[in-house]
């Protein structure tokens, strides 16, 4: 018989005031820790029209100088009822001593991005440094993302996209509220 797995000895922290203590380099992004949920709107010239979606973001840490990041989204119908999953991604945000943020983000659709940017005040701006594509992934050239804490419990998200022959332009935006 297999013994049950022991409790993980190094749980992630989801709030600045819970163990493990956040690494000092995380100071500029501590406000992101936790889970966020909200709704947004999106569109792109290669899609059949604009759409509404719901989104959940989670940021946590294990005491080292990076954040674990996960995002899930699903499309909503005209009555705000869930239609189907639409996007999912996960990765790591690495904070540097000079204030830079390096984000490694992967999607199950075969897209992996390395993004670089800065955390300035309540805003984190990230832009593509490199994109790696699986052989069957859609062509993505670059993205830009902005995360802004408008208050302790509200996070806005904006995402621009250059893909499938289209120039860089608005793709997604959402307003999220802190959960719990």
UniProtKB/Swiss-Prot annotation:
A motif (GXWXGXG) lies at residues 34-40. GO terms for molecular function: heme binding; metal ion binding; peroxynitrite isomerase activity. Its EC number is 5.99.-.-. It holds the Pfam family THAP4_heme-bd. It catalyses: peroxynitrite = nitrate. Binds 1 heme b group per subunit, that coordinates a highly solvent-exposed Fe(III) atom. Residues 1-20 have a biased composition (Basic and acidic residues). InterPro entries: Calycin, Nb(III)_bact/plant, Nitrobindin, THAP4-like_heme-bd. Its cofactor is heme b. It comes from the Bacteria. Disulfide bonds: none annotated. Keywords: Heme, Iron, Isomerase, Metal-binding. Residues 1-21 are annotated as: Disordered. Heme b binds at residue 171. Pathway: Nitrogen metabolism. Heme-binding protein able to scavenge peroxynitrite and to protect free L-tyrosine against peroxynitrite-mediated nitration, by acting as a peroxynitrite isomerase that converts peroxynitrite to nitrate. Therefore, this protein likely plays a role in peroxynitrite sensing and in the detoxification of reactive nitrogen and oxygen species (RNS and ROS, respectively). Is able to bind nitric oxide (NO) in vitro, but may act as a sensor of peroxynitrite levels in vivo. Belongs to the nitrobindin family. HAMAP family: nitrobindin (MF_01297). Homodimer. Forms a 10-stranded antiparallel beta-barrel structure able to accommodate a hydrophobic ligand in its interior. In fact, this fold hosts the heme group, which is located in a wide surface cleft. This is Peroxynitrite isomerase.
């Amino acid at each position: 018989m297999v013994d049950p797995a022991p409790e993980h000895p190094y749980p992630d922290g989801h709030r600045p005031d819970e163990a493990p203590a956040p690494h000092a380099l995380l100071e500029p992004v501590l406000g992101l820790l936790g889970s966020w949920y909200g709704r947004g709107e999106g569109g792109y010239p290669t899609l059949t029209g604009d759409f509404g979606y719901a989104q959940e973001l989670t940021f946590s840490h294990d005491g080292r100088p990076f954040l674990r990041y996960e995002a899930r989204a699903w499309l909503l119908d005209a009555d705000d009822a869930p239609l189907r999953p639409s996007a999912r991604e996960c990765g790591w945000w690495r904070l540097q001593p000079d204030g830079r943020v390096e984000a490694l983000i992967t999607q199950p659709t075969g897209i992996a991005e390395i993004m670089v940017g800065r955390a300035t005040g309540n805003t984190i701006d990230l832009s593509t440094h490199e994109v790696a594509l699986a052989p069957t992934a859609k062509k993505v050239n670059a993205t830009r993302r902005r995360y802004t804490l408008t208050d302790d419990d509200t996070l806005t998200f904006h995402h621009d996209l250059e893909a499938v022959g289209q120039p860089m332009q608005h793709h997604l935006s959402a307003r999220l509220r802190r959960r719990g």
